[in-house]
A protein has these predicted regions:
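N-terminal signal-anchor/signal peptide hydrophobic helix marking the start
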Residues: 1-3
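Short extracytoplasmic/periplasmic juxtamembrane "stem" segments immediately C-terminal to an N-terminal membrane anchor
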Residues: 23-36
Length: 120
């Protein structure tokens, strides 16, 4: 009986992990856009500090799920116009995928790309 329960728990755990990862990226993108809006409205720069465990801004934080690895710490500075101060490339690794966020200098825009970590 325990083998059946164990056998069923693995797919549920994997599904939960995928949902958690999807929600994390959705929240990260929302947090970034929200910080841009605040920078413009308050006419002061905003900072996102990204570590292996958290993404922290003034008044907000987002926990990085254990299934996601941040390659190294990043600091994104958003100016009063909502633009970036650097050409940051933030890389998030998971078991099977890598997501890269390439931020464009000055515009506040970014490009998100996904790459499989397994050979075809």
């Amino acid at each position: 009986m325990s083998f059946i329960i164990l056998g069923l728990s693995v797919p549920v755990t994997k599904s939960y992990q995928k949902v958690e990862e999807h929600l994390f990226f959705s929240h990260f993108e929302h947090l970034y856009r929200h910080q841009q809006k605040l920078a413009i409205l308050q006419q002061k720069q905003r900072v996102l500090d990204i570590s292996s465990t958290k993404i922290v801004t003034e008044g907000n934080s987002l926990t990085v799920p254990k299934s996601i690895t941040v390659n190294y710490p990043y600091r994104l500075v958003i100016d009063q116009m909502g633009g970036n101060h650097s050409l940051a490339k933030i890389i998030f690794d998971m078991t099977d995928r890598r997501f890269k966020y390439q931020f464009y200098l000055g515009s506040g825009n970014y490009q998100k790309t996904s790459q499989s970590l397994h050979s075809p």
